[in-house]
């Protein structure tokens, strides 16, 4: 009696590629900005996007926009879109959403942070080291907002 071959149900995750998709650095008020006392106000905006490229293969984009103002004037604006191609197979929907919305951005963030730091230094501004981001907490907040919004729509 032949036994049926067991189906492979083991989850699989792999990084295929990490790449820089888009980058921009603007210093609209230089060189005048270099003559002023440096007391920066740093604003960080971030966003993630993901899309399926093929069966079990996903592109995740982490977009970071850093705007630094000094004395109410923009010193510089830096935007980086750090991309990654990931294999994520045999995951339940919730696990896949967490993987694409938190785990992959955690992998991409150090690359984007290094690119921003390098661009800022090349613009001859003081080095900017972005603090780590807790993408797991951001993802949980997103899920809570989605649940609250669905609850409000049903009421």
Curated annotation (Swiss-Prot):
InterPro entries: SecB, SecB-like_sf. SUPFAM superfamilies: SecB-like. It is found in: Cytoplasm. Keywords: Chaperone, Cytoplasm, Protein transport, Translocation, Transport. One of its GO terms (biological process) is protein tetramerization. GO terms for molecular function: unfolded protein binding. Transmembrane segments: none annotated. It holds the Pfam family SecB. One of its GO terms (cellular component) is cytoplasm. Homotetramer, a dimer of dimers. One homotetramer interacts with 1 SecA dimer. Belongs to the SecB family. HAMAP family: SecB (MF_00821). One of the proteins required for the normal export of preproteins out of the cell cytoplasm. It is a molecular chaperone that binds to a subset of precursor proteins, maintaining them in a translocation-competent state. It also specifically binds to its receptor SecA. This is Protein-export protein SecB. It comes from Vibrio vulnificus (strain YJ016). The lineage of its organism: Bacteria, Pseudomonadati, Pseudomonadota, Gammaproteobacteria, Vibrionales.
